[in-house]
């Protein structure tokens, strides 16, 4: 069992759903295992053959779409921002992705892999957060990118 598989959850999927608007099948973070406010977060996503995207990408040789690996990193980045603030600061707020730079894909992610999603804050000014994200499987980098996001009022 890998080191990341043995780590205890800081936040499980029920807690994650209280902070993110995403729901299955588009919720791509299973649990948070490390967190330092305003600095860094590590989350995990177990990739199974039951993921709906594997029905068409690609049936004979299933590979997780790179854009969904980036989405998983963006969801981890949103968790880092919302968990870093006080509950009254994020009440009725939603995190919107504003940009992705420097996205790179290093190797395929396949059923049975466990994605480790590590995000770090590089800059924060007001409601805008800049972060770097690295996705790994078994310690090997599978994808990386820089993200910019903003916490905004939820529409009612």
Curated annotation (Swiss-Prot):
One of its GO terms (biological process) is lipid A biosynthetic process. It catalyses: a (3R)-hydroxyacyl-[ACP] = a (2E)-enoyl-[ACP] + H2O. It is found in: Cytoplasm. Its main location: cytoplasm. CDD domains: FabZ. Keywords: Cytoplasm, Lipid A biosynthesis, Lipid biosynthesis, Lipid metabolism, Lyase. Coiled coil: none annotated. It comes from the Bacteria. GO terms for molecular function: (3R)-hydroxyacyl-[acyl-carrier-protein] dehydratase activity. The keyword Zinc does not apply. The active site is at 57. InterPro entries: FabA_FabZ, FabZ, HotDog_dom_sf. Its EC number is 4.2.1.59. Belongs to the thioester dehydratase family. FabZ subfamily. HAMAP family: FabZ. Involved in unsaturated fatty acids biosynthesis. Catalyzes the dehydration of short chain beta-hydroxyacyl-ACPs and long chain saturated and unsaturated beta-hydroxyacyl-ACPs. This is 3-hydroxyacyl-[acyl-carrier-protein] dehydratase FabZ.
